[in-house]
UniProtKB/Swiss-Prot annotation:
Assembly, per entry: Homohexamer.
Entry's family note: Belongs to the UMP kinase family.
UniProt enzyme class: transferase
Binding site for UMP: G54, D74, T135, G136, N137, P138, Y139, F140, T141, T142
Protein source organism: Nitrobacter winogradskyi (strain ATCC 25391 / DSM 10237 / CIP 104748 / NCIMB 11846 / Nb-255)
Any GO BP annotation: UDP biosynthetic process
Lineage: Bacteria, Pseudomonadati, Pseudomonadota, Alphaproteobacteria, Hyphomicrobiales
PANTHER family according to UniProt: URIDYLATE KINASE, URIDYLATE KINASE PUMPKIN, CHLOROPLASTIC
Residues of the signal peptide: none
Residues involved in ATP binding: K12, L13, S14, G15, G55, R59, T162, N163, Y168, D171
Protein name (database record): Uridylate kinase
GO molecular function term, any single one: UMP kinase activity
């Protein structure tokens, strides 16, 4: 077995991906497959925390034009991430992989409040920790949440799972001449304006010297492949 490149990571999953081929909601085969990938990656000996978006259920930015304030809309979106984390927690537990959802919001009947101490405890117990509720504040994306939580819990990298196998000079689905980058600095990612993550996430990663690996989650086993250094993706690092 190839030795994993990292001891502790945060995996960032988009909520939209959990919908599968559906326009919204949670596609059970998709979330079960992702749970399997995460469990296999954990079996490599890597401590894993996961941040999930909520776009498959609700997008706060979109309702701001319909009379709902941006802070309220963002809060609704953050609550959608709690639902996704609970669904993923259940999928992991069905596979025999212990997991624990921690929320930025106080909701004791639903899941425990996120603290660094709690996250460290559950990671040390071989659980996959699911980080729900975004940052708990409006105007911040779940990409930024992933970098923030990674810095807080001492993760060595953020694994940004997307539907493309890295960062490209332009949209490869529209531009056949688009160039895929093997490696970028945080500053190059910011200056290039690449849409794979928002500027706040890249800026925080640069400040905390945290590597981000952008890869495609479309192929089963891709998370484990990235951890073993055999996967295809773009490394964004200082």
């Amino acid at each position: 077995m190839d030795r994993p490149a990292y001891r502790r990571v945060v995996v960032k999953l988009s909520g939209e991906y959990l919908a599968g081929s559906q326009p919204f909601g949670i596609d059970q085969p998709t979330i079960d497959r992702i749970a399997g990938d995460l469990a296999e990656a954990r079996a490599l000996g890597v401590e894993i925390a996961v941040v999930v978006g909520g776009g498959n259920i609700f997008r706060g930015v979109e309702v701001s034009s319909r009379g709902v304030s941006r802070p309220t809309g963002d809060t609704m979106g953050m609550l959608a991430t709690v639902m996704n984390c609970l669904a993923l927690e259940a999928a992991l537990e069905r596979r025999g992989q212990s997991a624990r959802a921690l929320s930025s919001f106080v909701m004791p009947e639903v899941c425990e409040l996120f603290t660094r101490r709690a996250a460290h405890k559950y990671l040390a117990e071989d659980r996959i920790v699911l980080l729900a509720g975004g940052t708990g504040n409006p105007y911040f994306t779940t990409d930024t949440t992933a970098v923030l939580r990674a810095a807080e819990i001492g993760a060595q990298a953020v694994l940004k799972a997307t539907n493309v196998d890295g960062v490209y000079s332009s949209d490869p689905k529209k531009d056949p001449s688009a160039k895929r980058f093997e490696r970028l600095s945080h500053s190059q990612a910011l200056e290039g304006g690449y849409k794979v993550m928002d500027a706040t996430a890249f800026a925080l990663a640069r400040e905390t010297a945290l590597p981000i690996i952008v890869f495609s989650i479309a192929e089963p086993g891709s998370i484990g492949a990235i951890l073993k250094g055999t996967g295809r993706g773009t490394i964004v690092a200082s």
